[in-house]
A protein has these predicted regions:
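A conserved FAD-binding loop/helix module that cradles the flavin
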Residues: 479-501
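Rossmann-like flavin
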Residues: 104-189
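Mid-domain catalytic core of redox enzymes
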Residues: 236-281, 287, 298-379
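Active-site-adjacent "gating/activation" loops or surface patches in catalytic cores
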Residues: 178-205, 469-472
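Helical element adjacent to the flavin cofactor pocket in flavoenzyme catalytic cores
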Residues: 195-245
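N-terminal glycine-rich phosphate/pyrophosphate-binding loop and immediately adjacent elements
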Residues: 2-131
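C-terminal segments that line or cap access tunnels to active or ligand-binding sites in enzymes
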Residues: 329-437
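A glycine-rich dinucleotide-binding beta-alpha-beta segment and adjacent secondary-structure elements
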Residues: 165, 169-179, 365, 424-483
């Protein structure tokens, strides 16, 4: 098929950032189309159906929750710029969350959507550090100071200026890394500030039906604004002449042109699509991008713009497995009703890195989607617990199918055993009778359904805050631009659309 269409803006990927960018651009009359390889929108924050049940992937809770009328926050900006009434998301606040360390769970910090709760707990359990904690919070840059240029300074060094107790340092980093770090055992200072505000100074909330509510709202806003969307229709190549993308070749053979291209699929993934149309050559030469940058022939180098040496985004190393257990009763009936999210680690030191084995069950995140303060009659009918642990993509990707399925079951049991050490005890037979369904996804699943290389949920550790690529009309939005999670992705799409298209 050789049909050809032109758009003001083509967006690669129908994830949260792509949808947000599309809505923003369509509001201002731009002819925009989103091209998505998969059959479901949402990207890393989507859902799937299995045996008649819908399971969220990605979203545990919406971060950055603030109440009505609070100004200068990411949530407020998103609602305003996407023209969403906050009631459309039906956000219910968390009950309360914990950070638990030690083999017996002996070190505990509580936090809620009231920052005073965590501060009071630190004052009680780490009295010598309370002044440092308050000074640390006061030193966090505001949102208006973030994002102009990446501050890749070690967040551990930054926190070390204020907090001396190594246990408290590890406990502070545990939830922030699990919910937003692409770097092993550290964070960029900017990312630390964003996540600390999102979790500790703002908070968690969730719609009754999870990510499906958010997606329904976004898709309807995009449709009403006049945006086009093509599902199961990915981009296979970005053909470039000189320093500009000239054509997008779709997987079905169609050719699309656009004045601007916004890509939400990741930095490395986007660059892997680029094909240089070089005058004088018989055929375009693909540019192969690796962790050390481009592998280019002398011929192609003579014809392409010299690339910024700093623009060598490596593939991310951090991926996860997640188990899901569905109950025929609410978690509180089992004695698990007070926790919304539990971040656990079974020693005093938190090791946030790609594990040597398939899974690292020593630490993880336990989420109870039922344990939010839903309006009457709006809580999920069935109970659920989700447990997330670090995983090694390479140890999963090449397994024969029979071994793969067996390993999933083996690790499901091991992850449950590890997580339950940090929850009130429930007899095995009671839990077995209450369980009506289970599932598990792995790094291999993540790559299959999102196309993210190495199952890297948080993308490359090298972020590009201005979204610029070696091509002057191709820009990044989403995880590799630097904002993560649902709120971060939405904000990224809005910001990149504003910066690169609407302000020109």
């Amino acid at each position: 098929m050789n049909s050809r269409s032109h758009y003001d803006v083509a967006i690669i990927g129908a994830g949260m950032s792509g949808l947000a960018a599309g809505i923003r651009l369509a509001h201002f009359g731009k002819r925009v189309c989103i091209f998505e390889r998969h059959n479901a929108p949402g990207g890393l924050n989507s859902f799937y159906s299995l045996a008649g049940r819908k399971y969220d992937v990605g979203l545990h809770a919406l971060t950055n929750f603030v109440g009505p009328g609070v100004k200068g926050t990411p949530l407020g900006k998103i609602l305003r710029q996407l023209r969403i009434d906050r009631g459309e998301f039906e956000l219910a606040e968390q009950r309360g969350s914990r950070i638990v360390f030690g083999a017996q769970g002996e070190h505990v910090l509580h936090f809620t959507n009231d920052p005073a709760v965590l501060t009071a707990d630190i004052a009680q359990k780490f009295p010598g550090e309370i002044d440092g904690w308050r000074a640390l919070l006061a030193a966090l840059p505001g949102y208006d100071a973030l994002g102009a240029a990446v501050d890749a300074t070690s967040a551990r060094e930054f926190v070390g200026r204020f907090i001396r107790d190594p246990l408290l340092v590890e406990m502070i980093f545990c939830p922030l890394m699990f919910y937003g770090s692409a770097r092993e055992n550290d964070m960029d200072c900017d990312q630390f500030a964003i996540m600390a505000r999102a979790l500790f100074l703002e908070g968690f909330a969730r719609p009754p039906d999870g990510v499906r509510v958010i997606l329904r709202v976004l898709l309807e806003k995009y449709r009403v604004a006049g945006g086009e969307r093509r599902m199961k229709c990915g981009v296979s190549r970005i053909v470039a002449t000189g320093d500009r993308a000239t054509t997008l070749v779709l997987e079905n053979g169609e050719e699309i042109t656009a004045d601007h291209v916004l890509s939400s699929i990741g930095a490395v993934e986007t660059l892997n699509l680029v094909e240089r149309a070089v005058p004088g050559l018989r055929s375009p030469e693909p540019v192969e991008w690796g962790e050390e940058g481009p592998a280019r022939s002398e011929t192609s180098m003579e014809n392409e713009r010299v690339r910024d040496d700093a623009f060598h985004p490596p593939t991310g190393k951090l991926s996860f497995v997640e188990t899901m257990t569905v109950f025929d009763r609410q978690p509180e009936v089992l004695g698990w009703g007070s926790d919304t999210i539990v971040f656990f680690n079974d020693s005093a030191r938190f090791d946030y890195a790609r594990p040597a084995e398939q899974v690292d069950p020593r630490s993880g995140v336990i989420c109870f989607p039922n344990n939010f303060e839903y309006a009457a009659g709006r809580a999920p009918a069935e109970g659920m617990v989700r447990v997330t642990c670090l995983a090694n993509y390479d140890r999963w990707v090449q397994l024969p199918e029979e071994t793969y399925q067996a390993d999933k079951q083996r690790w499901f049991a091991e992850i449950q055993r590890s997580a339950r050490r940090f929850l009130p005890p429930v007899p095995e037979d009671t839990l077995a009778r209450a369980t009506v369904a289970t599932d598990i996804f792995t790094p291999r699943t993540i790559t299959k359904f999102t196309s993210h290389l190495a199952g890297a949920v948080y993308g490359s550790p090298q972020k590009i805050p201005d979204g610029r690529t070696p091509l002057r009309n191709v820009y990044l939005c989403g995880t590799d631009q630097g904002f993560v999670g649902v709120i971060g992705a939405l904000l990224s799409g809005i910001s990149m659309a504003n910066l690169h298209v609407l302000r020109k």
